[in-house]
Each structure stands twice: as C-alpha cells, then as structure tokens.
C-alpha cells in the first residue's frame, strides 16, 4: 500500500509499505529516499509520536494515510525511566519538555495515566509544570517511576 510522509518544508514523499512494517522500517525507507538518518526522524500520526518497534497496523495507519515527519533537533535527549519492577523505559525528550510531557510519554509506552505517576530524580519528586532542564535532567539520566495510590498524594 502507499502512504504519504509530509515534511515541515511541505514536501510530500510517497512510500510503498505493508501494514506489518514497523516504524523502524518506514524510517529506513525515508532514509533511502531522503538521506535523513532514522535517529533524526520523528514520525507523527493523528497527533501521536510513533514508536520504532510498533507496526503501521498498531496505529491503524491505512493506505493513503499521511504521516508527518519532524526532524529531531540535536538537543534531543534520551533518558530512562525505571519502574518499581526494574523495567527501564527509554524516552526521547527535549530539555524544554515539562515533567507532565514526560509523564505523557511514559503513558504512551506503558499505558499508565500521568495522574498515577510520581517521577523521582536525584531524590526529589518532580513537579508537573517544571521542565527537564529545571532539574538538570540530561541524556542518560535515570528517573524513577513510583505509582501513586488512589487518594494518595
């Protein structure tokens, strides 16, 4: 099937894909056509950033759907969020992202609503309206995720 990828410059790229293709595969096809390395690509569909390991079918992307390609700035940063079970979730952030935005990214990957998340870094609970930069969260930083019990603050 054919899908379209629209860049910020307004250019539209046509790609031949299968619904079983992963987002990684799609990024590789964009690299073949446009020469943009996959690690600099962010693909958006229906307002959501698409995760590399998922397939087009997972996002209900059908023939003639249009994805939006946003280039990742060099300032983009990869952090880890560690859950109580010891699982580490990798999240791509910008220094200007709010803690609330980081919680939304955790929700996209893990399905945990932001209201149930408490993020801890350097022994401090992080406030939703502050940014990663406010807490000096940088590439490679590890945040700890604690689940808030209902009614608990």
UniProtKB/Swiss-Prot annotation:
- What CDD domains does UniProt report for this protein, alphabetically? Ubl_NEDD8 (cd01806), Ubl_ubiquitin (cd01803)
Which residues belong to any copy of the Ubiquitin-like domain? 1-76, 77-152
Please provide an example of a Pfam family that matches this protein in its UniProt record: ubiquitin
**PROSITE patterns named in the record:** UBIQUITIN_1, UBIQUITIN_2
> What molecular functions are annotated in GO for this chain?
mRNA binding; protein tag activity; ubiquitin protein ligase binding
Q: Does the keyword Cytoplasm apply?
A: yes
In the record, biological process GO terms are:
modification-dependent protein catabolic process; protein ubiquitination
Q: Does the keyword Ubl conjugation apply?
A: yes
Query: Which segments of the protein form a coiled coil according to its record?
Result: none
List the GO cellular component terms. cytoplasm; nucleus
Lineage top rank: taxon: Eukaryota
Q: Which InterPro entries does the protein's record reference?
A: Nedd8-like, Ubiquitin-like_dom, Ubiquitin-like_domsf, Ubiquitin_CS, Ubiquitin_dom, Ubiquitin_ubiquitin-like
Q: Which SMART domains match?
A: UBQ (SM00213)
Position(s) of the covalent cross-link Glycyl lysine isopeptide (Lys-Gly) (interchain with G-Cter in ubiquitin)? 48, 63
Q: Per UniProt, which keywords does this protein have? A: Cytoplasm, Isopeptide bond, Nucleus, Repeat, Ubl conjugation, Ubl conjugation pathway
Question: What residues make up the propeptide removed on maturation?
Answer: 153
Q: Where is this cross-link: Glycyl lysine isopeptide (Gly-Lys) (interchain with K-? in acceptor proteins)?
A: 76, 152
Other notes: Ubiquitin is generally synthesized as a polyubiquitin precursor with tandem head to tail repeats. Often, there is one to three additional amino acids after the last repeat, removed in the mature protein. Alternatively, ubiquitin extension protein is synthesized as a single copy of ubiquitin fused to a ribosomal protein (either L40 or S27A) or to an ubiquitin-related protein (either RUB1 or RUB2). Following translation, extension protein is cleaved from ubiquitin.
Protein's job: Ubiquitin exists either covalently attached to another protein, or free (unanchored). When covalently bound, it is conjugated to target proteins via an isopeptide bond either as a monomer (monoubiquitin), a polymer linked via different Lys residues of the ubiquitin (polyubiquitin chains) or a linear polymer linked via the initiator Met of the ubiquitin (linear polyubiquitin chains).
Into which family does the record put it?
Belongs to the ubiquitin family.
Q: What is this protein identified as? A: Ubiquitin-NEDD8-like protein RUB1
Q: What would be the name of the gene that encodes this protein?
A: RUB1
């Amino acid at each position: 099937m054919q899908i379209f990828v629209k860049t910020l410059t307004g250019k539209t790229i046509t790609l031949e894909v299968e619904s079983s293709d992963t987002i990684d595969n799609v990024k590789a096809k964009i690299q073949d056509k446009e020469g943009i390395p996959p690690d600099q690509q962010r693909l958006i569909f229906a307002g959501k950033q698409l995760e590399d390991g998922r397939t087009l079918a997972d996002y209900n992307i059908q023939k003639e759907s249009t994805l939006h390609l946003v280039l990742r700035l060099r300032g983009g940063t990869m952090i880890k969020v560690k859950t109580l079970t010891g699982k580490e979730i990798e999240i791509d952030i910008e220094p200007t992202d709010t803690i609330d935005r980081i919680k939304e990214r955790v929700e996209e990957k893990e399905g945990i609503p932001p209201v149930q998340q408490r993020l801890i870094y350097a022994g401090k609970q992080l406030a939703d309206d502050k940014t990663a930069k406010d807490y000096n969260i940088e590439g490679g930083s590890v945040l700890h995720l604690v689940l808030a019990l209902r009614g608990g603050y």
